[in-house]
Design a protein with these regions (language model features):
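Active-site- and interface-proximal helix/loop "cap" or "latch" segments in soluble metabolic
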Residues: 1-36
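Mid-to-C-terminal Rossmann-like scaffold of FAD/NAD(P)H-dependent oxidoreductases
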Residues: 38-50, 419-442
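Beta1/beta-strand and adjacent pyrophosphate-binding region of the FAD-binding site
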Residues: 41-60, 76
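Glycine-rich FAD pyrophosphate-binding loop
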Residues: 70-90
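Short, solvent-exposed loop/turn and secondary-structure capping segments
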Residues: 86-90, 100-101, 107, 263-265, ...
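N-terminal glycine-rich dinucleotide-binding loop that anchors FAD/FMN and/or NAD(P) in oxidoreductases
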Residues: 90-139
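Conserved redox-cofactor binding core of oxidoreductases
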Residues: 148, 152-353, 374-375, 429
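Glycine-rich loop(s) and the adjacent beta-strand/alpha-helix scaffold that form part
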Residues: 348-354, 358-432
Length: 442
C-alpha cells in the first residue's frame, strides 16, 4: 500500500489501522507486513510481432493506436503505468479547435445560431480584448522577420503589438495574408455595430483555423536567455496540428465521447476562445453519460478520451482481436536493423519479465517529455532566467514523464529540437514549488 500524494496523513492513518488489525488478528509475520514489500517473480520472456508498435498510452499514443487499427493495422501498445491515460488524464482535458457552427460565418454574418448534428446552438460571443487583437494582426508587418528589431526594443512574450512590427517568418506569410482577409471581412461587419454602441461581448466570436495557426506561431515565438537565437513552431507541423484537429471532436464522438457542444471557452495559457470541453462518454449509445466516479474530473477526462479509444482498439474496430495493450511494461530499448531503421522495441514488465515486440511497419514513440525530472529541465533550460526554475519547481505532469522515450530515440541517432524551451504555467511558486489549481480553469 503506497502513500498517496495529497492525502499523506490519511494514507498513514489507513496504514496504521491495517497494522493494528493485523496485530489483533495475530498475524504470523507482522514485521514482513509492516515492510509493505511485494516480491515479484519474472515470467517467461514474451516475444510478439505486430504491424505497429506504440510506446505510451496517453492521448497521442491511444489516438495513434486507434487510427492505425482503423487503417487495418494490428497494434501493440506498451504503457509503463498501470492504466492508460498518460499525461492527458492528468491534464485540464480541453483541446483547442474552432467549431464553425458556434462562431461568425462570413456566408451568413448575421446568424445568431448554428447547427451541429441536427441540434441548434446559440453562437458564442467575444471576450473583452478580442477585437483589439484582431486589429493588431490586421496591421502586422508582412516583411521578413527581423530579429535585429529587438536589439533596441525589449522582447516581451505575448506583447503582439510590439512583435507585429518585427515582421513574419516567410513560411507563415501566406497564412497571415489569408487571415488578414478573413479579419477584414469580419471587422467590416462588426465595426459598425461597435460604433453604434454595441458591446464587444455581444458580438459573435471570430475564430478560424488560420487564426489558430498564426496564434500558435506568434505564441511560441521566443528568444533564448542569451538573446542569441529564436525558436518557433514548424509551419508544416502547426498546420497539420490545427487542420487535423478540426476532425478530432467528431472522430471521438463516433467512438462514444461526449463534449459540451454549446461553448468555446478559454483556459490559462490559451490565446483565444476555442476550447472544447469534455463531458464523459456514452459507450452503450443510450444517450446518457457513463458513470464517472461521482463526477471526478480525472475520471471524466478518462471516459472522454480513453474509455472510448480503448473500447475501439480492443472491442469494436474490425481487427480488434489483433490488438493489445500491455500495461506496467517499461520500454527500455529500440531495436534497429542493419540500415538503422527502428523495427521493434525491448522492455521489461513490472515483475521483471522481458518483453520484445517486433514491428513490421513502424514504431511510434508517444512517451511525452521530462517535466517530472526537474533537474533535467534545469540542465537543458536555455530560455528561463536564472532562478526562475529551481529544484522546488513543481509539475502538473505525471511522475512517469522523465524523458525515457527521448533517451531511447537519441540512443539510435534521433535528433531533437527545442529541448531548452520548457513551457511553464503561471500557477507555481518558485520558492517552494506549491501549485495552484492544476486544471487550468479560471
Amino acid at each position: 500500500i503506497d502513500v498517496i500524494s495529497g492525502a499523506t496523513f490519511t494514507s498513514i492513518g489507513f496504514k496504521n489501522a491495517l497494522i493494528d488489525a493485523a496485530k489483533q488478528a495475530e498475524a504470523s509475520d507482522l514485521d514482513g507486513f509492516k515492510k509493505n514489500t511485494v516480491v515479484h517473480t519474472a515470467g517467461e520472456a514474451i516475444e510478439k510481432t505486430t504491424d505497429v508498435v506504440v510506446v505510451g498510452a496517453g492521448g497521442a499514443g491511444m489516438a495513434t493506436a486507434v487510427q492505425s487499427a482503423q487503417n487495418g493495422n494490428s497494434v501493440v501498445v506498451l504503457e509503463v503505468n498501470s492504466e492508460i491515460g498518460g499525461n492527458t488524464v492528468a491534464s485540464g482535458g480541453q483541446f483547442q479547435s474552432a467549431q464553425s457552427y458556434l462562431v461568425w460565418d462570413p456566408a451568413d454574418p448575421d446568424a445568431t445560431t448554428g447547427v451541429y448534428k441536427g441540434v441548434t446552438y446559440n453562437k458564442v460571443h467575444n471576450a473583452t480584448g478580442n477585437i483589439k487583437v484582431l486589429k493588431e494582426i490586421l496591421n502586422w508587418n508582412e516583411n521578413e522577420f527581423d530579429s535585429k528589431y529587438f536589439d533596441s526594443t525589449p522582447f516581451v512574450a505575448g506583447d503582439i503589438e510590439t512583435l507585429s512590427h518585427a515582421g513574419v517568418h516567410a513560411e507563415y506569410l501566406g497564412t497571415l495574408k489569408e487571415l488578414k482577409s478573413e479579419i477584414q471581412a469580419y471587422l467590416n461587419w462588426a465595426q459598425p455595430q461597435l460604433d453604434a454602441g454595441k458591446a464587444e461581448g455581444e458580438i459573435t466570436l471570430f475564430s478560424t483555423p488560420n487564426l489558430h495557426i498564426f496564434q500558435t506561431y506568434y505564441g511560441g515565438l521566443r528568444q533564448n536567455a542569451e538573446k542569441t537565437s529564436w525558436i518557433y513552431g514548424s509551419y508544416d507541423l502547426v498546420k497539420q496540428f490545427v487542420e487535423g484537429g478540426q476532425d478530432l471532436k467528431g472522430w471521438l464522438e463516433d467512438q462514444g465521447a461526449i463534449f459540451d457542444n454549446s461553448i468555446q471557452p478559454i483556459i490559462v495559457g490559451a490565446l483565444w476562445n476555442r476550447e472544447n470541453d469534455f463531458k464523459g462518454s456514452d459507450l452503450n449509445g443510450d444517450g446518457t453519460p457513463d458513470p464517472d466516479g461521482k463526477n471526478v474530473k480525472g475520471k471524466t477526462v478518462y471516459n472522454t478520451y480513453f474509455a472510448t479509444t480503448r473500447k475501439t482498439l480492443l472491442e469494436t474496430v474490425a481487427n480488434h482481436a489483433d490488438n493489445e495493450i500491455m500495461l506496467r511494461t517499461k520500454v527500455t530499448e529500440l531495436i534497429t536493423d542493419k540500415d538503422g531503421k527502428v523495427v521493434g522495441v525491448k522492455g521489461v514488465q513490472y515483475d521483471g519479465t522481458p518483453v520484445t515486440v517486433h514491428a513490421k511497419k513502424g514504431v511510434v514513440l508517444a512517451t511525452g517529455g521530462y517535466a517530472a525530472d526537474i533537474k533535467r529541465v534545469m540542465e537543458t533550460n536555455d530560455y528561463w532566467p536564472d532562478g526562475d526554475i529551481t529544484t522546488h519547481t513543481g509539475t502538473t505532469n505525471r511522475s512517469s514523464l522523465v524523458g525515457s522515450g527521448i533517451d531511447m530515440a537519441e540512443a539510435v541517432g534521433a535528433a531533437t529540437t527545442g529541448m531548452g524551451f520548457t513551457q511553464m504555467m503561471p500557477i507555481s511558486w518558485v520558492d517552494n514549488g506549491n501549485l495552484a489549481f492544476g486544471g487550468g480553469h479560471y
